[in-house]
Amino acid sequence: MLLALLFMRFEAIPSLRKLCRRLEKRRYAREICEFTGDRAPKHNTFSLFISRAGSDRIEGLFTGLRDQAFRMGIVDPEASVKVSLDSTFMKAYSRRGRKGGIGDRGARVGKTDRRNYELGWRVHTVASMSALPINYVVRAANVNDKDLVDPLLKQAPRLVKRYGKRISHVIADRQYYSADVFAAVRKLGAEPVIPYPSNVKDPLIDLWLTKRFKVKGDPRLVGLYRLRMSVERSFKAGKLELMMENLRWRGVAKVRMHVAICFACMYAVAILAHRIGRPELANSIAAFTY
């Protein structure tokens, strides 16, 4: 069942019903998902599995692949790990209507970009420089990014430390700029690389963005800040190639499961690329799809 949920993301199949049709019609699909015979489970069987498995078991797939990647030295071969911190919006699975309306009670209205708002969730993620997510937290879209820094920075250092590594730099965009965030990062023994907004009078760092979004300041910090795109690359891979934006589940637990499956696919690709001796394909999801 878990293999089928991964296969669903790789093949960009939008719903469980269409997944079942693909499994029924295509023998190769049943073989990949390890279903024997000529018949595949029905969509209600998958729905029952998802409900009974729970978020812990589904997220266990992500953590298992992530830990395997750490042991193989895929996530970051260096002892000092640089991480990038950011969040991305996911539209809630809901629609208006007196008779056919669907609601997601846990979702809230939040920013999708600078000017637009929608009902949804935000995935707050810490990613390595190899564009692989180390850990993540899912919250309603109206929760401030800075409020999730503490839980994210409590989990990531513990995980990295298990493999004899430490976090040396935390790179983030200017919405994370605050004295509390800087203090939390420095408490870990890491250096914050977060530009200050234009309205700050006494900045904590020699790094800022111009009106045209060009980064200025200390050349060393400018070079480090440009590494922030690693977390954006992981979001891009999830949304464009693994249907991370095609959220068809409701409730925070199932949204976490959806994100865990997408991130697990990224690790599956990275691990397979290294095992076949093609590490340059570690971030190429398209190279491993039909």
What is each model feature region?
Residues 1-61:
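Short, positively charged, Gly/Tyr-enriched micro-motifs
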Residues 22, 64, 241:
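Short acidic/histidine-centered micro-motifs embedded in hydrophobic/aromatic stretches
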Residues 48, 52-187:
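Polybasic low-complexity intrinsically disordered regions
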Residues 169, 174-240:
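Helix-centered, glycine/charged polyanion-binding patches within enzymatic domains
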Residues 221-290:
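Basic, amphipathic alpha-helical segments enriched in Lys/Arg and hydrophobic/aromatic residues
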